């Protein structure tokens, strides 16, 4: 049976409006790369005084082929086809193949952790780079930003405002993102054409020979490490894949050629400008110039900087929203603790996670204050995302081979792109000592939390006593008698317990013994209907289905909810829908209420019991496993409450604490008490 939900349409057909939305949602990161890619390449080689024609042509060739191979071929042509009901990204890919091998969770959590870590650096890099364009630039005779300190203040202000407005939703301003990004791409493409017309010989950079030649040329003073800067041109490719569910694959197919053309034209235009100005004395000793801004007419610089700032904000917004989505997916897949997820806008796909928002804000500001300028940030940027891309390649290999049975393509992806990404990783690893350790540290913290959460789930499942799970059939008679025991007060009309999903068919109608203990032993709870509800997270993103088994009664209901990994788990709403359907179908009797404000009310009151586990001192498992479980229980103190997570904030909820006993229970019978004989 299906549940009534407001499902977000993830597979949109190709349309002008769809492609416009795509420009605002998908291309923010990769679209702002021209702000710092060539700047980073030139600075890495010692400045404009150390570049030559071969160096510039080779650099542009490296950027071009990186965009073509990594973004166009791997992600647009191959990865976008590996979708989970229209959803993309590393976790969506993982859900497609996780049943094939348990170890695939390793590349999934590593890739997810590094993608989140990289997303924390992106807003700081893009906004700082854009604002630096204002430094020393006269506006109406006055210099608005005269030094780096003022750049930092303005950057921090913009980022703080951006993060502050997240809780109110961004759907209103989000409607303008697409048109603004269309203007941005058209503008940078036009500037590129204008410069390229000055020296069409730059088109020889289309030949990959110049890219390969530069890697081994003496003109290149950093050797293969130049790829650490080149890689910045494609860091947004992973975000492109992750955001597929918001806009649809076909809208990316339709819009990418235009986006790619504008990016390539701008890079080529910057290359021409560098060749034409490498001998200009004014630039010889400049250490912080940006060829992106220098390559345009003076009268366009101020509009360009303002437009770049807005584009950087849009790119940052896309990364922030992407982080919310990534965390939400990880929670549903039981890879991260449950934390409160809000939906501030009318659009169901727009999330807001308060704790994630403020952690991102704090990290972004810390990055700005620590690195102080974009050059230092660029030195740290990109290392984490190379790891994400490698992990995606591993998962793509298993998807193409094991699921699609296209083994030739699978090995091409693994060997070809795996080799390229390994080289990029080696080149980017040199950034570790220049600030790359920041993103590695952030990624490690996220990875540690993911590992603890995933591993503790495995420990609990493998060490819980088999006797801790019982069949409802064995207690059917007792529940019947308790229901009809008039000497006990009616606890509630509908008593609902959230139980753990059990494997079918052996686990059918099986629940944890502590649930029956709560009903029968701890304090007998008399109710008209006993509900045992299990939430199963499916590999599809927007599944909303359920099954029921009444065990041939009208007082026991075993419900299995099947919800997609992107669905809200609003149990209260779903249970009320189910009981109305069951009463309408004659599976349950009506529950008329004598005292009510609702005319013709058929459903009685609900009480929800949530059982909270505390690690018992009687637990006997390996010391390391015990530490992991204890860390998990500590983390749970900072997570969302089950009542909030399951949409029960305004329901009648009771929390019962029970000991969590794992492994073999300590024998206490060997300690036999002997009664003392009292002296007469």
Swiss-Prot record:
Pfam families: K_trans, K_trans_C. GO terms for cellular component: plasma membrane. InterPro entries: K+_transporter (IPR003855), K_trans_C (IPR053952), K_trans_N (IPR053951), Kup (IPR023051). It catalyses: K(+)(in) + H(+)(in) = K(+)(out) + H(+)(out). This is Probable potassium transport system protein Kup. The keyword Ion transport applies. The chain crosses the membrane at residues 16-36, 60-80, 103-123, 150-170, 177-197, 222-242, 255-275, 302-322, 351-371, 380-400, 407-427, 432-452. Transport of potassium into the cell. Likely operates as a K(+):H(+) symporter. It is a multi-pass membrane protein. The keyword Oxidoreductase does not apply. It comes from the Bacteria. One of its GO terms (molecular function) is symporter activity. Coiled coil: none annotated. Keywords: Cell membrane, Ion transport, Membrane, Potassium, Potassium transport, Symport, Transmembrane, Transmembrane helix, Transport. Belongs to the HAK/KUP transporter (TC 2.A.72) family.
